[in-house]
């Protein structure tokens, strides 16, 4: 009953912030991607015949604030003690290939836009493996503040030879060599009216 309780703690923190935001708009930024997006990929490594377990969070976008855009590619509010595995370490230690690692530029518009989330792809380079994940904010996007727009949702996609499945959670789902896992973390909510955004900042966003 307490598994993945960090997701509940994160949402409680966010609930308080959202309730206070209309009354403290100069101190509280818009909503962020919120979820730790707990990621566990494991199995028996073909190279060593030893068990392997990749366990990490995913980073995402934070909400815009009164005087700045949201931060991009940071871990969630209740996740200060775990780390994203560097690409080189992940590929050396585990039977995976990191095929993509980039910003997800879908974030909430505003005078100060939300920060960007991330897209990270893992290609399974092992005869088989299993994946267990949890990502909240799959249905409800990060909220905008002071007339800012909503951010984007967290998504986990698994591509097999004949199918693509997108969910918020996977539990011991079987994978085979060549299957691809895509983690898409959401962008933060925007702060302030988007039409008040500085023209130079809009141009920078577009380029």
Regions found by a protein language model. Name each.
Residues 1-207:
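Glycine/proline-enriched, intrinsically flexible loops and inter-domain linkers
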């Amino acid at each position: 009953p307490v598994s993945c309780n960090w997701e509940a703690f994160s949402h409680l923190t966010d609930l308080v912030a959202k309730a206070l935001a209309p009354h403290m708009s100069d101190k509280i930024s818009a909503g962020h991607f919120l979820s730790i997006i707990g990621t566990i990929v494991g199995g028996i490594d073909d190279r060593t015949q030893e068990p392997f377990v990749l366990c990490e969070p995913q980073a995402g976008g934070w909400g815009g604030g009164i005087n700045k855009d949201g931060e991009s590619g940071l871990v969630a509010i209740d996740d200060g003690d775990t780390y994203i595995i560097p690409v080189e370490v992940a590929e050396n230690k585990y039977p995976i290939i990191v095929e993509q690692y980039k910003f997800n530029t879908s974030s909430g518009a505003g005078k100060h836009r939300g920060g960007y989330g991330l897209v990270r792809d893992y290609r399974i380079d092992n005869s088989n493996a299993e994946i267990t994940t949890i990502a909240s904010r799959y249905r409800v996007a990060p909220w905008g503040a002071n007339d800012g727009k909503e951010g984007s949702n967290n998504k986990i996609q698994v591509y097999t030879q004949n199918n693509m499945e997108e969910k918020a959670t996977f539990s011991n789902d079987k994978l085979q060599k060549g299957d691809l896992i895509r983690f898409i973390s959401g962008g933060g909510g925007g702060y302030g009216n988007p039409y008040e955004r500085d023209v130079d900042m809009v141009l920078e966003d577009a380029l």
